[in-house]
């Protein structure tokens, strides 16, 4: 797991939990090993903590979920990979002169099955976030992903993608290098691959930047993750000319896992540990590994033509429209 000495920024709705956790930790430091009174007090505080977490996490608003998945302690692709894969190696470069650190990938084994993995990669702390461009890939990142996916298709290896980005990099240089074209080519090619593709939204799934590695046979989503055409802040600024309307925008956009399951956008919602994946990254990775294994077992029974047909029809069914 990636570690950081940086003090986490706690969202307002999580402050009561953070304060109670702090009290428990202080008591643990002060308590003698066999002090029954203090140990009983610690146990009582821990029970209160669990009750408080259940109360808060059972009623999170869409905007609160967004703030939750933006926490720096949220597990990233490279946090999950060691817990999911038995062995793995990262591969680099798009063979066109770029190696975007905001999008990582490689080959590995999950329960003895060879796979190719690809995922957005955020940083922790200012220095690492700048190096990773805050998880916003440039065109070279999507071309690197495409190279790896073509490798998987050639050698018959399933593809696992992990989505966690506020969006593709929208800088002038990205446009000069063909950001739109790079994402569009990925969409086209992912529909043509003859191997199983399982996409998992592990954090923030933002716009075309998420969709650039988001075409799959199964779309999984962690319980508190979000998936949206635009951030609530951007949507509010566009529609209401006021980013303070982001709460209303988040409600209207239907960004939560439960909303998207009802709408048929995602196939499965994966349970997270109490407190979110950041509270227990290892357990979260094991939940994810179990579901990925089941999905691969199921999809591997289908022939390539059936996979492609189902994948195409799956995305054609999304959304609603009227014919005039």
From Swiss-Prot:
Record note on quaternary structure: Acetyl-CoA carboxylase is a heterohexamer composed of biotin carboxyl carrier protein (accB), biotin carboxylase (accC) and two subunits each of ACCase subunit alpha (accA) and ACCase subunit beta (accD).
Subcellular locations according to the entry: Plastid, Chloroplast
Coiled coil: none
Protein name according to UniProt: Acetyl-coenzyme A carboxylase carboxyl transferase subunit alpha
Reaction(s) this enzyme catalyzes, per UniProt: N(6)-carboxybiotinyl-L-lysyl-[protein] + acetyl-CoA = N(6)-biotinyl-L-lysyl-[protein] + malonyl-CoA
UniProt similarity note: Belongs to the AccA family.
GO CC annotation: acetyl-CoA carboxylase complex; chloroplast
PANTHER family membership: ACETYL-COENZYME A CARBOXYLASE CARBOXYL TRANSFERASE SUBUNIT ALPHA, ACETYL-COENZYME A CARBOXYLASE CARBOXYL TRANSFERASE SUBUNIT ALPHA, CHLOROPLASTIC
A Gene Ontology molecular function term of the record: carboxyl- or carbamoyltransferase activity
Role according to the record: Component of the acetyl coenzyme A carboxylase (ACC) complex. First, biotin carboxylase catalyzes the carboxylation of biotin on its carrier protein (BCCP) and then the CO(2) group is transferred by the carboxyltransferase to acetyl-CoA to form malonyl-CoA.
UniProt cross-references to InterPro entries, sorted A to Z: Acetyl_CoA_COase_a_su (IPR001095), ClpP/crotonase-like_dom_sf (IPR029045), COA_CT_C (IPR011763)
């Amino acid at each position: 797991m990636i570690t950081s000495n940086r003090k986490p920024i706690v969202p307002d709705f999580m402050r009561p939990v953070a304060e109670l956790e702090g009290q428990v930790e202080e008591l643990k430091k002060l308590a003698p090993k066999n002090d029954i009174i203090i140990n009983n007090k610690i146990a009582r505080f821990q029970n209160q903590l669990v009750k408080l977490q259940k109360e808060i996490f059972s009623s999170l608003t869409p905007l609160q979920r967004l703030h939750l998945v933006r926490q720096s302690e949220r597990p990233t692709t490279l946090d999950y990979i060691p817990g999911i894969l038995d062995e793995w190696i990262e591969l680099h470069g798009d063979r066109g002169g770029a190696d975007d650190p905001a999008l990582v990938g490689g080959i590995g084994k999950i329960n003895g099955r060879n796979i190719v993995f690809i995922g957005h990669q955020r940083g922790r702390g200012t220095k690492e976030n700048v190096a990773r461009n805050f998880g916003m890939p440039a065109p070279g990142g999507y071309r690197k992903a495409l190279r790896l996916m073509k490798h998987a298709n050639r050698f018959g290896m399933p593809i696992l993608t992990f989505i966690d980005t506020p969006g593709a990099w929208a800088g002038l240089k990205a446009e000069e290098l063909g950001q739109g074209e790079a994402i569009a080519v990925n969409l086209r090619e992912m529909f043509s691959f003859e191997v199983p593709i399982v996409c998992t939204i592990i954090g923030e799934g933002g716009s075309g930047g998420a969709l650039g590695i988001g075409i799959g046979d199964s779309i999984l989503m962690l319980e508190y993750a979000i998936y949206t055409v635009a951030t609530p802040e951007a949507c509010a600024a566009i529609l209401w000319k006021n980013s303070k309307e982001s709460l209303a925008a988040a409600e209207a956009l239907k960004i939560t896992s439960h909303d998207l399951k009802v709408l048929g956008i995602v196939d499965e919602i994966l349970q997270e540990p109490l407190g979110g994946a950041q509270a227990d990254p290892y357990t979260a990775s094991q939940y994810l590994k179990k579901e990925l294994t089941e999905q691969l077992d199921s999809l591997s029974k289908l022939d390539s033509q059936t996979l492609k047909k189902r994948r195409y029809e799956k995305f054609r069914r999304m959304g609603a429209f009227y014919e005039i």
